[in-house]
C-alpha cells in the first residue's frame, strides 16, 4: 500500500525477487515511476525485463551502506512523486547497530506516511538483527517459500510458491496464497 511499508522475506530461489519485479512492473503501469535501491548489488536487468520491468522508467541506485540506503529512501519519500521504492537488502553485510537502524527507520516513517509512495523491503530469512526494528513500522509482512518445481515434459518451466501473510495491519490473521511463477513471464495463481 502507498504510504506504508511492505516487507518480503525469503531465501534464494523462493520466488521473492520474481514477485518483486512483477510488483515493479505493475507500479510502472499508468506512467508510474519506481526506484530500485540495490544495497545487495544483485539487480539483474535482463531478468527484470523478462518480468515486465521497463528499465527506462526505473532508477537503479547502488548505495554502499545501510545509512546511505535509508537516507536515500527518506529523500525519495520526501519528494513524494514515486509510485514505488524497493529496498533490496538480501545480501547486505553492513554492521550498523540495530539501535541505529531503528533510529533511521523512525526518521523514514513520517515522510513515507505523508507520501503516495509504497515502500517494499526485500530481506533474507532468517532476518539479520539490524532489521528487527523494521517489524514495528511494517504494515504487511510476507514470507515467500518455494513449494515445488513446475515441469513441462523434462524441462523446468517454473515453480510454485506459497506466500504467507505473517502480518497485515488492516486484516489480522495469517493467510496463505499459492502462486505459480513460470519462466515465460507469466505469474498465475489464486492471489491475483
Where would I find each of the regions flagged by the language model?
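The Walker A/P-loop phosphate-binding site
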Residues: 1-55, 69-78
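Phosphate-binding/switch region of NTP-binding enzymes
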Residues: 110-113, 117-192
Amino acid at each position: 500500500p502507498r504510504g506504508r511499508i511492505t516487507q518480503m522475506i525469503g531465501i534464494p530461489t523462493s520466488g521473492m525477487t520474481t514477485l518483486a519485479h512483477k510488483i515493479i512492473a505493475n507500479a510502472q503501469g499508468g506512467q508510474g515511476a519506481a526506484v530500485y535501491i540495490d544495497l545487495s548489488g544483485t539487480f539483474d536487468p535482463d531478468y527484470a525485463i523478462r518480468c515486465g520491468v521497463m528499465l527506462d522508467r526505473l532508477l537503479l541506485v547502488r548505495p554502499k551502506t545501510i545509512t546511505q540506503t535509508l537516507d536515500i529512501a527518506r529523500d525519495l519519500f520526501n519528494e513524494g512523486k514515486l509510485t514505488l521504492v524497493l529496498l533490496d537488502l538480501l545480501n547486505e553485510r553492513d554492521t550498523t547497530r540495530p539501535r541505529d537502524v531503528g533510529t533511521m527507520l523512525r526518521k523514514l516513517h513520517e515522510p513515507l506516511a505523508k507520501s503516495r509512495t509504497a515502500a517494499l523491503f526485500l530481506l533474507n530469512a532468517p532476518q539479520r538483527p539490524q532489521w528487527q526494528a523494521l517489524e514495528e513500522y511494517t504494515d504487511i509482512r510476507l514470507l515467500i517459500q518455494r513449494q515445488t518445481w513446475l515441469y513441462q515434459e523434462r524441462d523446468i518451466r517454473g515453480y510454485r510458491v506459497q506466500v504467507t501473510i505473517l502480518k497485515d495491519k488492516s486484516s489480522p490473521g495469517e493467510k496463505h496464497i499459492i502462486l505459480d511463477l513460470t519462466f515465460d513471464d507469466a505469474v498465475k495463481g489464486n492471489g491475483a
